[in-house]
Amino acid sequence: MPKMKLVVVGNGMAGARAVEEVLARGGADQFDIAMFGDEPYGNYNRIMLSNILSGAQDASEIFINPLSWYGENGIKLHAGARVTEIDRAARVVISENGTREDYDKLLIATGSRSFIPHMAGLNTAEGKIKPGIFGFRTIDDCNGIIAMAKRSQRAAVIGGGLLGLEAARGLINHDCEVHVVHLAGHLMEMQLDGTGGAILKSSMETMGIHVHLRKLTVGILGDDNVTGLTFKDGSTLDCDMVVVAAGIKPNAEIGLRCGLTVERAIVVDNHMRSVDDRNVYAVGECAQHRGRVYGLVAPLWEQAKVFAEHITSRNPDAAYHGSKLATKLKVMGVELASMGITEPAEDRDEIIQFTEPKKGTYKKLIVRDGRLVGGILMGDISKAAYLMQCFDRDAPLPDERLSLMFDIGTPSQKITIDEMPAGMQVCNCNGVTKSAIAACVSSGKRSTKAVMDATRAGKGCGSCKTLVGELVEWLCGGEVEEDPSVHYYVPTIPLRKPDLAKAIREQNLKSVSAVFKALAGGVEDAPSKPALASLLITLWHKD
């Protein structure tokens, strides 16, 4: 039986993950696969762009699928070829450089781009964006920001959401003053309430970042180059560089041009298939499902799996029913878990709250009819796995509500390893589930380091390393192959985290390169740089 032709428009995290899922289900025997990507690179982890900006990682270190991966898996990649036309009648995709690919099945995974709102002075007389103004979405964006930061005195980041704070985190490692201006009354209003936002603001200010709230940017000052911002309230802020992180806009225009239904994004059904064409699918930030467009990684992974199950006929009934939004991440060196709503929405909603601002600790849970409908954990996220499972499964909660936050003598409300569902995400940065780690151990990897190297779990912000180690030990029945370096915070430095922190303080080491030079004989471990950079921010944020 001849193979069908699958063409994927988009080589970002959504498109490449969807292809990985297809291959994992034997899709190489069913399809010849061709991919188009706007950028001249393989697929990389956009979550780690702030590490590129800060200098903690080189761009080459964040690639999930390097260019060699495509050929090795029989995939024809058209890198740096933006698709400008889809002819659904002829079933052909055409790029701006004239490359054509016929298809039997088409996946659109064009993602999103930085939303740059209209502001006076944004463009030059020629209609181009003024020099010194950047989005924060791609490797090329990072390279431009880094080059500008070398000669910048004061940088302004427009947007105090997750993306804006990641940009600010990256900029503080350069010798320029960093200001964050935000329209809302507190930072990260999609994940935090006012109290949590205030604690985060305080943490940022101790790191030397200036935060300006309730500021609507209406103009950019300067004729040929940026000299400042002007706000709706009449105030101004001097700066010579602007990073716009005010949200994202789905890249759905290609769907509109080929006649697909597009609202905020390309409208899809429960199979991630266009509502207009049974041969066209869409996943990721360019897809709209039941009125929602998802910007977090976990929904993207779920959509990719449903697409792969359906298109390979592994499970023709596979369906995506939407995602309950829950995330665990590290922002400005502060560990954070957020799920569901941040404020009570009904009179019967019950709030359990604990605040310890000096330690940067904040916990808030919203319970409705004995079920968790929202939660914020900041600083101490030891209960996050249990609470996120309760939230995801809509499980009944114990009557002793304080046990949800603290160990108070009642049975500990923490999820055990064996209670973790197979599909539970262990590493949010790289989308690694419990089942993926179990499969890795079954394949013969018997040490935590080997599993981390093979699956990329724990290779992002580093906050899941302990859980990964516990899971590997459980899967190995306690017979883990001992690798001394697994206990080291950095493999090339033979010190556990507390001892490493002590050595850093005693030797006054304030950069990643200084730590490697002093404690590892100059031998650098690239995958450990993000976690080490985060540790340095935590240790020195008051200096």
List each model region and its residues.
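Rossmann-like NAD(P)H-binding beta-loop-alpha module
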Residues: 140, 144-192, 226
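Mid-to-C-terminal Rossmann-like scaffold of FAD/NAD(P)H-dependent oxidoreductases
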Residues: 1-5, 11, 286-385, 408-435, ...
